[in-house]
Amino acid sequence: MASTNDLKNGLVLKLEGGQLWSVVEFQHVKPGKGPAFVRTKLKNVLSGKVVDKTFNAGVKVETATVDKRDMQFSYMDGDYFVFMDMETYDQLMIDRKVVGDAANFLVEGFEATVAQHEGEVLFVELPAAVELTIQETEPGVQGDRSTGGTKPATLETGHQINVPLFITTGEKIKVDTRTSDYLGRVNS
């Protein structure tokens, strides 16, 4: 249990029938009249739904213990991603639905943070940027500027992103895992 005065970004709360909500934003408000309160923006850990919720200041809320572990992606087994714990070398099978958009950037050997609560995997978190190889892209034509200087490219994971015209097949690039944006070339 924690007080609403102790809220901070990233804290996971157990509310409304045992659902887990992560604090995205919070603001302590002390109006001129009346009691103080805490205005929060909460994100459902499983569904990703974001809601605004207001708590009275000092009210006790139940916190959830979320165990985050660094794991290495090993291989795919049907619709499951198999991760290996970097400390114990135990393997963990995670359903594609739980992995979500992180699947677009997972290559064998990549490290990710796996969050669990009471043995259930909540989500897979990747670093903000990863380095991937361009598997296929059309050659960029010098005079072709009608598309704003970008062209589609397929990454080694099969995910498609837009890259600048000068990028060629086989090049290693840095990609933002949150937005799928091209960040730059990787110097060999």
Swiss-Prot record:
GO terms for biological process: peptide biosynthetic process. Keywords: Cytoplasm, Elongation factor, Protein biosynthesis. It comes from the Bacteria. SUPFAM superfamilies: Nucleic acid-binding proteins, Translation proteins SH3-like domain. The keyword NADP does not apply. Pfam families: EFP, EFP_N, Elong-fact-P_C. GO terms for molecular function: translation elongation factor activity. SMART domains: EFP, Elong-fact-P_C. Its main location: cytoplasm. Pathway: Protein biosynthesis; polypeptide chain elongation. PROSITE patterns: EFP. The keyword Cytoplasm applies. Belongs to the elongation factor P family. It is found in: Cytoplasm. This is Elongation factor P. GO terms for cellular component: cytoplasm. Involved in peptide bond synthesis. Stimulates efficient translation and peptide-bond synthesis on native or reconstituted 70S ribosomes in vitro. Probably functions indirectly by altering the affinity of the ribosome for aminoacyl-tRNA, thus increasing their reactivity as acceptors for peptidyl transferase. It comes from Streptomyces coelicolor (strain ATCC BAA-471 / A3(2) / M145).
